[in-house]
């Protein structure tokens, strides 16, 4: 699921080592996420897909760094449910396209196995870098990336690629770990991340791999910094929403023009500090 070669260079690790890290967790990645987050990641992802992405039949979806297919499956399920409510046959995705793009072939293989096992036969799987997407300009209505963008070495380039492949009116949706904003959670989260998670990782797969993942979380920009990066890539209507006291965050931006708009430096819309809030997009405030 992760862009291991470039991330490895950033952290001073060899490509072979970092590839080994993510290959080692590929078969247990989803299960380990359940154990290490106590299942909370499922609540975040449900809110992310159903309330923020809001998939509609007939749309084109690209999920980047989504090798095991979790978000793509949720998008597919949501489309089928919405299609049924509109009187569309729910077993087909006629006119809808869901594409998973990932640079890690083993993650993709695990996703394809699950797709075959659970009947998700309408999903396309593409092995490619999020920084060099093999898709035409304006090909998608929605670009999602869940717990993956922190591992891109050139995030500005990845965001520009997201802008390029989206249609005008298309939306960028990013779900990622972030900076804790609730003081009461800071110390417990630190103990959880650097105490329990690596030890649990050692029992389920290997400690080194999950210590590596925790370090990548710490290295990711804070909410405001990343929101500005999205603006700098040309997106409008940029906003973010903190989940569980800022442990995770949903970032949203809209491609409002064919070419990138001039970035603003205005402060973002205040984050909503509840995972139950919806992701209704509102205009950014004017710059001071």
UniProtKB/Swiss-Prot annotation:
Residue span of region Disordered: 260-288
* Species of the source: Leishmania donovani
Task: Show the HAMAP family listed in the entry.
Answer: MenG_UbiE_methyltr
**What's the protein's topology in the membrane?**
Peripheral membrane protein
Q: Which cysteines are joined by disulfide bonds?
A: none
Q: What is one Pfam family matched by this protein?
A: Ubie_methyltran
Q: What else is known?
A: This protein may be expected to contain an N-terminal transit peptide but none has been predicted.
Q: Quick one: which residues bind S-adenosyl-L-methionine?
A: 68, 102, 146
Q: Which UniProt keywords apply?
A: Membrane, Methyltransferase, Mitochondrion, Mitochondrion inner membrane, S-adenosyl-L-methionine, Transferase, Ubiquinone biosynthesis
What is the protein name for this chain?
2-methoxy-6-polyprenyl-1,4-benzoquinol methylase, mitochondrial
Q: Where is the composition biased (Basic and acidic residues)?
A: 279-288
| Known partners and oligomeric status | Component of a multi-subunit COQ enzyme complex.
Coarse class of the protein's main subcellular location: mitochondrion
Q: Where is there biased composition of kind Low complexity?
A: 260-270
GO biological process terms held by the UniProt record: methylation
Catalytic activity field: a 2-methoxy-6-(all-trans-polyprenyl)benzene-1,4-diol + S-adenosyl-L-methionine = a 5-methoxy-2-methyl-3-(all-trans-polyprenyl)benzene-1,4-diol + S-adenosyl-L-homocysteine + H(+)
Is Mitochondrion set as a keyword in this record? yes
- Role played: Methyltransferase required for the conversion of 2-polyprenyl-6-methoxy-1,4-benzoquinol (DDMQH2) to 2-polyprenyl-3-methyl-6-methoxy-1,4-benzoquinol (DMQH2).
Top-tier EC class: transferase
Query: What Gene3D superfamilies does this protein's entry cite?
Result: Vaccinia Virus protein VP39 (3.40.50.150)
Q: Name one GO molecular function term.
A: 2-methoxy-6-polyprenyl-1,4-benzoquinol methyltransferase activity
Q: Which SUPFAM superfamilies does this UniProt record tie to the protein?
A: S-adenosyl-L-methionine-dependent methyltransferases
